[in-house]
Amino acid sequence: MAVVLERVARYAIPIGIGFTLLQSSIYDVPGGKRAVLFDRLSGVQKQVVQEGTHFLIPWLQKAIVYDVRTRPRNIATTTGSKDLQMVSLTLRVLHRPEVGMLPQIYQNLGLDYDERVLPSIGNEILKSVVAQFDAAELITQREVVSAKIRQELVQRATEFGIRLEDVSITHMTFGKEFTKAVERKQIAQQEAERARFLVEQSEQERQANVIRAEGEAEAADIVSKALDKAGGALIQIRRLETSKEVATALANKGAQVTYLPFGAGSNAQSSSGSGLLLNVNP
């Protein structure tokens, strides 16, 4: 039994040491990541290690793993516009490292490269671009401002080995004085629109009155011409129609009324020649 234990102890230690060395010489690079090897003798290796399982020399070499997937980051700053209005801006940046430049990124910036670079260049470019526009232009030409910021920021980030997939303005606010001035301007524009509407409405009503008056004048002219053409006959017809209406009204009130055509007898003549007989017994 003692011999067996001695043999186990004899082989267990080398096996354990070998297993430990093997385990420490293997490392994994997960999906969406890349690795950079640092050698204690030669420094950072230029080759970028791809995804998968790889070997290294324990103690002499160390693997530094980078996430190369696109990640979002917000950059906020407060600066002044061309007309000295205070503007607060927030940018949303989608970024990732250039895979081929990972060794240089590790040498110059380290693992927190985005924290070191993006806020600095973001604030620099935001202040530079915003200073080229008035506060009103920042609102009316927002797409132009955003495109200019994107162009300069992409170019600047490339110098540090960072690729920007998208840059957009997500938040923009102005100082209280400018906000109040914009509100006053909007109220003035609304009042001007209302006044213009009232003027147009009055003009339409005036035109309608003119058209109505012209129509009435034309109708009166037609009636006048008809009277001139028909002579007394038309007047006599109107008189008879009026007499009928009066007789109907009196009959409805209980009066005994007899209607005779105009000129139907001497007794039928009234002082006005209306052709009505009142209180006539049948």
Curated annotation (Swiss-Prot):
SUPFAM superfamilies, sorted: Band 7/SPFH domain (SSF117892)
Compartments in which it is found: Mitochondrion inner membrane; Cytoplasm
Major place of residence: mitochondrion
Chain positions of motif AIM: 106-109
Cytoplasm in keyword set: yes
Highest taxon of source: Eukaryota
UniProt keyword annotation of Cell wall biogenesis/degradation present: no
InterPro entries documented for this protein: Band_7, Band_7/SPFH_dom_sf, Prohibitin
Membrane topology reported for the UniProt record: Peripheral membrane protein
SMART domains, per the entry: PHB
GO CC terms of this entry: cytoplasm; mitochondrial inner membrane; mitochondrion
Gene Ontology BP annotations: mitochondrion organization; mitophagy
GO molecular function: mitochondrion autophagosome adaptor activity
Keywords carried by this UniProt record: Cytoplasm, Membrane, Mitochondrion, Mitochondrion inner membrane
Family in the record: Belongs to the prohibitin family.
Quaternary structure and partners: The mitochondrial prohibitin complex consists of two subunits (phb1 and phb2). The subunits assemble into a membrane-associated ring-shaped supercomplex of approximately 1 mDa.
Role according to the record: Prohibitin probably acts as a holdase/unfoldase for the stabilization of newly synthesized mitochondrial proteins. Involved in mitophagy; may act as an adapter for atg8 that supports mitophagosome assembly. Negatively regulates the proteolytic processing of atg32 via the i-AAA protease. Acts as a negative regulator of the m-AAA protease.
Protein name per Swiss-Prot or TrEMBL: Prohibitin-1
Source organism of the structure: Schizosaccharomyces pombe (strain 972 / ATCC 24843)
